[in-house]
């Protein structure tokens, strides 16, 4: 190789000297190549020239004699500034480096062929996008636009042009390295295997990327042209994903085939592998097939409101994600994420509330039974309200307003209202329902009707004594509390002290009366005072009538002396016997004797109080009857005639009230006469 270097002087007045071929020849170290050197010094004025004059060298210097290609020469032109004279060695070393590089490239043709392949790969990897950005900035002045990454040009270059350039560079690289023969057979075999692998994977990846980008672009085009709420978008998504998956599966199969592996065995695997796949991956395979069914049939799509019941758990929410292998995600009403396996949707009922065409209004309005005369007009006006509402469906579906039934608990008149709102949105349905209910309540208020309220019956529980003494009207209708006199029971020690103070001290010849006799005498003394109090309270019973009653009581006592006398004597005998036995036992102990006397007195007092309580209840019965007869002025006449009269007349048909009343009165008279005779 011959290298020719030329140094060009510059003058201040821009006079350019043509430099011809030098007269001297300098042999190189090898003795083969000749380097022509011509040195021309610059004048003193040229040293003061501006550096800009150097840029005019090429345009003003004229033509330089070219070197023939047959000489295989490399021409290096340089402009040297005046200095210490070190320019020669630098220029010479540079020429030597270039000479060696050129000789190396010329001696090995495979390296020369690698340059375009490596250049294509480097350009596709690092130079394509900057070049596109530079062209966009130069032509459209939109280099800083944020949407440049999403432009169609960017998408085409990155999705189609870049994979093809990478594939071209890989193929050229493999073609260049294929003729190279390595010294060892093992290295040659490894080289061939690697080249086959590189060709296969580059081909599969390049065309798979282009095909997948094309499928995504087609899917995006069809989904953008349709309505976003259209359910066909889910079908396009399913088709795109299926073809996308199939493309990559085919690419993997092709890659295995290009490597020399047979994919038929993998695709038609059976026997033990199928059994293991069935047992281990049954749930995964079931979910995958169920997801295919969901995408194909589209029972629900994204952002739809569904309701289902899975394992006894109510699920209601918006569909957030429909997975292939992963579960479907439902965003609940409380904003919780519910993950449901896809195969659950194929075996359970799913309600899609978003796909509703109408929402139903169904309710009951209960009118009071007191407004039964207004029910016809109320129902008619309610029908008019629904027929005039434009948001209520009038033609396709029913519209019902009827008096459905009567509530057996409170006798309320229940009106059925059933209609459909022409909307699929739940919020709009609630607004229409609110307006309809307010209009129906306005109709009820316009007619002066009342809504029914619950009716409760409160009953008072009475004991047997109160049931015997209370009137029938008080028990069934009035349920009023009885104004009865309460009996005052004094303690036993006070009664004993009163008896001791009132009774005179017995003479030595007389015996002291027993406690039973004392109590009987006390009862006989208290009876006239009670009868006197009753006559004072009644105020209408004359003295002659009281005397006649006393005479009748005396006659009755003579007739019943044998029976009642015997009964009283028999009842008093055990008490007397017990008192005598206790006295005998307590002769030695005076304190014990006093305690025994007190206990005997208490026993006799309890018996007398029981008999007096029975007499008092009978007397209070008579007083309550008199009070009922005298208090008719306070109670209303309408209640007395309608409520009590009708109820008593109706009850006489089933209950023998008169007979029981007469029997109870006779029994009371006989008991009073018996007590008086005693």
UniProtKB/Swiss-Prot annotation:
Q: Where in the cell is it found?
A: Plastid, Chloroplast membrane
Ranges of compositional bias, category Low complexity: 502-517, 556-571
Q: Which Gene3D superfamilies match?
A: 1.10.287.1260, 2.30.30.60
Keyword terms of this UniProt record? Chloroplast, Ion channel, Ion transport, Membrane, Phosphoprotein, Plastid, Transit peptide, Transmembrane, Transmembrane helix, Transport
Q: Which Pfam families match?
A: MS_channel_2nd (PF00924), Msl2-3_C (PF24956), MSL2_3 (PF25237)
Taxonomy, superkingdom: Eukaryota
UniProt feature coiled coil, ranges = none
* Stretches that traverse the bilayer: 104-124, 154-174, 194-214, 242-262, 266-286
What does the tissue specificity note say? Widely expressed.
User: What's one GO-annotated cellular component?
Assistant: chloroplast membrane
Q: What happens when the gene is disrupted?
A: Msl2 and msl3 double mutant shows abnormalities in the size and shape of plastids with enlarged chloroplasts containing multiple FtsZ rings.
User: Which residues fall in a compositionally biased region of kind Basic and acidic residues?
Assistant: 578-596, 615-628
Bilayer topology: Multi-pass membrane protein
Q: Name one GO biological process term.
A: monoatomic ion transmembrane transport
Annotated SUPFAM superfamilies? Sm-like ribonucleoproteins
- Name positions with the PTM Phosphoserine: 599
Which segments carry the region annotation Disordered?
494-637
Function (record text): Mechanosensitive channel that opens in response to stretch forces in the membrane lipid bilayer. Controls plastid size, shape, and perhaps division during normal plant development by altering ion flux in response to changes in membrane tension. Acts as a component of the chloroplast division machinery.
Under the heading PANTHER family, the entry gives:
MECHANOSENSITIVE ION CHANNEL PROTEIN 3, CHLOROPLASTIC (PTHR43634:SF15), OW CONDUCTANCE MECHANOSENSITIVE CHANNEL (PTHR43634)
Q: Which family does it belong to?
A: Belongs to the MscS (TC 1.A.23) family.
Q: What is this protein called?
A: Mechanosensitive ion channel protein 3, chloroplastic
What taxonomic classification does the UniProt entry list for its organism? Eukaryota, Viridiplantae, Streptophyta, Embryophyta, Tracheophyta
């Amino acid at each position: 190789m011959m290298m020719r270097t030329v140094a060009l002087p510059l003058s201040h007045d821009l006079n350019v000297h043509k430099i011809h071929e030098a007269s001297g020849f300098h042999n190189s170290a090898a003795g083969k190549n000749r380097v022509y050197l011509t040195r021309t010094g610059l004048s003193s004025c040229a040293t003061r020239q501006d550096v800009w004059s150097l840029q005019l060298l090429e345009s003003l210097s004229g033509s330089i004699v070219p070197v023939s290609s047959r000489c295989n020469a490399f021409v290096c032109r340089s402009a040297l500034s005046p200095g210490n004279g070190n320019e020669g060695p630098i220029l010479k070393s540079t020429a030597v480096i270039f000479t060696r590089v050129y000789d190396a490239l010329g001696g090995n043709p495979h390296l020369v062929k690698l340059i375009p392949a490596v250049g294509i790969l480097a350009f596709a990897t690092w130079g394509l996008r900057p070049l596109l950005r530079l062209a966009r900035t130069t032509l459209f002045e939109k280099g800083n636009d944020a949407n440049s990454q999403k432009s169609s040009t960017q998408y085409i270059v990155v999705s189609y042009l870049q994979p093809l350039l990478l594939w071209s560079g890989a193929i050229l690289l493999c073609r260049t390295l294929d003729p190279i023969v390595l010294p060892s057979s093992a290295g040659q075999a490894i080289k061939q295997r690697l080249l086959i692998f590189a060709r296969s994977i580059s081909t599969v990846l390049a065309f798979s990327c282009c095909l997948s980008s094309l499928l995504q672009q087609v899917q995006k085009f069809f989904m953008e042209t349709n309505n976003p709420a259209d359910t066909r978008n889910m079908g396009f998504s399913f088709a795109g994903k299926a073809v996308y998956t199939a493309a990559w599966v085919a690419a993997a199969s092709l890659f295995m085939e290009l490597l020399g592996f047979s994919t038929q065995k993998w695709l038609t695997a059976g026997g033990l592998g199928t059994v293991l796949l069935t047992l281990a991956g049954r749930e995964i395979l079931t979910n995958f097939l169920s997801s295919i069914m969901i995408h194909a049939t589209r029972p629900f799509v994204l952002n739809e409101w569904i309701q289902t019941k899975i394992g006894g758990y109510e699920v209601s929410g918006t569909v957030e994600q429909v997975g292939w292998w992963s579960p479907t995600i439902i965003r609940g009403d409380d904003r919780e994420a519910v993950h449901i396996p896809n195969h659950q949707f194929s075996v359970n009922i799913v309600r899609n509330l978003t796909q509703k065409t109408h929402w139903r209004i169904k309710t009951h309005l209960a009118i009071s039974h007191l407004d039964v005369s207004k029910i016809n007009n109320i129902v008619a006006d309610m029908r008019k309200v629904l027929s005039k509402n434009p948001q209520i469906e009038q033609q396709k579906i029913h519209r019902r307003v009827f008096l459905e039934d009567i509530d057996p608990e409170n006798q309320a008149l229940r009106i059925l209202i059933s209609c459909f709102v022409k909307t699929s949105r739940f919020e709009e349905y609630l607004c229409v329902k609110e307006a309809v209910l307010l209009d129906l309540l306005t109709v009820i208020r316009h007619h002066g009707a009342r809504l029914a309220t619950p009716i409760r019956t409160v009953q008072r529980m009475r004991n047997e004594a109160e049931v015997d003494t209370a009137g029938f009207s008080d028990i069934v209708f009035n349920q009023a509390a009885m104004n009865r006199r309460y009996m005052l029971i004094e303690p036993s020690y006070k009664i004993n002290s009163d008896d001791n103070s009132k009774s005179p001290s017995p003479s030595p010849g007389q015996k002291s009366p027993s406690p039973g006799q004392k109590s009987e005498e006390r009862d006989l003394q208290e009876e006239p005072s009670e009868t006197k109090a009753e006559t004072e309270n009644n105020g209408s019973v004359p003295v002659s009538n009281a005397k006649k009653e006393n005479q009748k009581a005396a006659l009755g006592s003579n007739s019943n002396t044998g029976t009642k006398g015997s009964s009283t004597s028999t009842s008093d005998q055990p008490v007397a016997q017990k008192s005598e036995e206790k006295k005998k036992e307590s002769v030695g102990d005076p304190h014990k004797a006093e305690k025994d006397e007190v206990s005997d007195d208490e026993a006799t007092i309890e018996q007398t109080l029981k008999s007096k309580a029975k007499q008092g209840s009978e007397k209070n019965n008579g007083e309550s009857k008199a009070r009922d007869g005298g208090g008719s002025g306070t109670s209303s006449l309408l209640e007395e005639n309608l409520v009590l009269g009708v109820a008593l007349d109706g009850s006489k048909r089933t209950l023998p009230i008169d007979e029981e009343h007469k029997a109870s009165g006779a029994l009371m008279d006989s008991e009073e006469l018996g007590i008086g005779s005693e």
